[in-house]
Structure formats: structure tokens, C-alpha cells
Amino acid sequence: ARLSRKAGNQRRGIAGYMDTSYYNRFGGEELMRRLASETLLAQGPMGSVLLSECGAADIPPAFWNLAEPQTVSRIHRLYAAAGAQVLITNTFQASGHALDQDEIAPSMAEVNRGAVDDARQANPQLLLGSMGPIAIEWFVEDSLEYREIRANAREQASALLNAGVDGLLVETVTSIRNLQPVLAGAHDAADGMPVLVSFAIDDKGDLLGDGLNIEGAILYAEKHGANSVGVNCCSLTAATAAVPRMVATATTPVTVRPNAGNPVQTQDGLVWREDPEAFARACVEWKRAGAAMVGSCCGTTAVTTAALADALDI
């Protein structure tokens, strides 16, 4: 792993002093440089692939980071072999609150560091630390609940950055209320490291939770420090329609990672209808419209990643 150490480098965060000596400054700079100059290919999902493993339907994805690290690393290696330049840690639901809800015993820091170590086994060009929404209701900013979400996000962000990720990815954001304390917590820990934000939208381009259009969501995220904005876990149609709208609005690099559509319940569990060729055709449009990073989300596999790599001529 590429680690940039600055002796005694500390900053005062909302919870006091944090040691940022192990933050991967060079990796963060490279991530932003390449987002500004290339169309990068990100890996596909971790959760839906892990859930499809034999007998794993009821096992929280974060559990695998320490219990079966070789399985997590194998999935990352498949994506890297398919052409993914950006890997994403298996930490979407690995905040302290989420781990408590899933009754996962190891500490939040151990689970997140394990996920980074698992991904590093695939020798990624770039590595993003995934952060998902935190399921705590809050009503007033600076309330006890708001501060709890912010603290959870800050602690997870710090764990990921200290483990050596090149940047943070706050993804599948369904509302501004969903985003606000998580983004604040991520920035509490980031100390200048990149924080990317990705929204979940419907086919009209509106956020799934509060109905805000993608333009408004982008303006909010950028105003509050997002270094990149995008969409994920939406339909292919929604993603393709959203890219030019996002590029026209954003002042930061735009990302796009749709899913494979709605799964179908079968005797063997949930099954997605993966269509790599459709993703490859759409990818040409995303790149032409100005997307800085493309990829795929729930229901896809390394087969779709390979099709996207072919479309990008990687």
C-alpha cells in the first residue's frame, strides 16, 4: 500500500485531535488528477455478489471482511482482472451503528481495516472507501441523533483513511437529510482527502427519498464540500438520462454506476437479469457526455465490468 506519513501530523476535529499521519495523500492527489483527465472504470458491487454466494443470503456483507477475507479479495481480484481501475471497499454498511444492528462483534475499525486489506490484495490502481447511509432518524440539526450519525460517519471515515484508501465514497444517498450528517462526519475526518458523493435516483432523475431533482442534489453536495458527484443504484435508463444533466450542473467530476434493474425472486433466491451489452452501449454515451468515472451497481458482476472495459478500450 502507498502510504504518505507526515510525522506528528494532527488536526483538531469536532471530537478533538485526530492523527492523520497515515492518510494516503499521494493516492488522494492521483485520484483527483485522474478523475479530471480520464474516464475511470470502477468495480461492480460487493453486496449483491456476496449475497449470491452459497448459503450467504442472510449474512451481512461486512461480516465477510474478517470471517472470509479470501472471498472478499477474490471478488476484488475478479473486478481488477476484468479491467476495473478503481476498487471500492466492502464497507457500505460498516459504520459502528450498522455493525451493531447486524450483531457483528469485531470493532468498527477492525472491520473497515480488514476490508481495505482485502481490497489491497487485488493491487488496485485506486481504492475508494465506501460509506452508506446510517439508519438513525433525526429531526433537528445538532440534536442527539444528528450528532450520533455524524460521529458514526466520522469514525468510519477515519478508520478507512487511516487504513490507506485514496478517498471516501458516500454512496446510495436517497435524500439530503440522508446525506447531511454523513457528509459532515466524513469531512470531519477527511483533512483534505477526497470525498465523493453518489445519489440514488428514480427514472425522472429525482432522489428516491425526498424527490429533489439531481441538479439540486448536486448543488447541495458541492456547496458542502463534495469533490465529485454522481448517481448509483439506479436504472440504466435513469443513469443515461442523468449524466448530461449532471455534467451541465456540476463543477466537480461526475460518476455513474447504475444497477441491473429489479431482482426476481426464484427458488434459489433473488436473481438479477444482468445485461453487459446494454451497459457497454450506455457507457459510450456516458463517456461522450463527460462522465469521469463509470461502473455498475447491484445485480452486476465482473462480466459487466469486462464489457465496460471493452467499451472504454481499457
Predicted regions and their residues:
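Domain-level signal for soluble alpha/beta catalytic cores
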Residues: 16-314
